[in-house]
Amino acid sequence: LIAFSISMGVLVYVFMNLSLYYSSIISPIILGSQLAIPFGILASAIMLGENISSKKWLLIFSAFIGILIIFFDPKLANNFLGLFYASLMALSFGLSQVYSRELRNLDVSLLNAFVGLIGFLVLLIISFFIEKNTLTNIISINMDSWLLISYQAIVVSLGAHLLMFYLYKFYTV
């Protein structure tokens, strides 16, 4: 549960924000995030011993080659660091999918609450050490930003993540 929470609640968001910071356009983030499924399949083979069919190996290979081919576009070549962090985000998400397989028996509300709590605490501690003045920064957030944060918390965390965690109970990575 802790590994899942760190992977999903901390690493995905850290790498997503780093990829946004280091990209001048959104394309590298979209491209890198497409690797979540291939990373998840590879992680399930390594960590859970699942068999990967030759068809899936071909699709995984095609996904990585496709990213390499697309990335020769000159606009994307200047955003390599953004793609790198987006790929790490996809890897973290893929790992969280594998970890979730072991958490099928937990209630999805408990799972979502634990991910949120661990993510909040770890990111808050990291923020204190890296950013300094964390409380001052939180207090200075304007109302429009709080509305966006509320949307993220309600629609994404309570809606989409709960549904995703629910589906993890029934489907393989």
Predicted regions and their residues:
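Specific transmembrane alpha-helical segments of multi-pass solute transporters/efflux pumps
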Residues: 1-32, 69, 153-171
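Hydrophobic transmembrane alpha-helices of multi-pass small-molecule transport proteins
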Residues: 43, 52-72, 89-91, 123
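A helix-boundary/kink motif common to multi-pass secondary transporters
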Residues: 24-25, 48-53, 107-108, 172-173
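Structural signature of hydrophobic alpha-helical transmembrane segments
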Residues: 20-36, 79-91, 144-154
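Hydrophobic transmembrane alpha-helices of multi-pass small-molecule transporters
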Residues: 13, 37-45, 60, 67, ...
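Hydrophobic/aromatic residues within transmembrane alpha-helices
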Residues: 19, 46-48, 52, 103, ...
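Hydrophobic alpha-helical transmembrane segments of multi-pass integral membrane proteins
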Residues: 3, 59-62, 81-85, 104-157
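Hydrophobic alpha-helical transmembrane segments in multi-pass integral membrane proteins
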Residues: 11-17, 68-79, 120-135
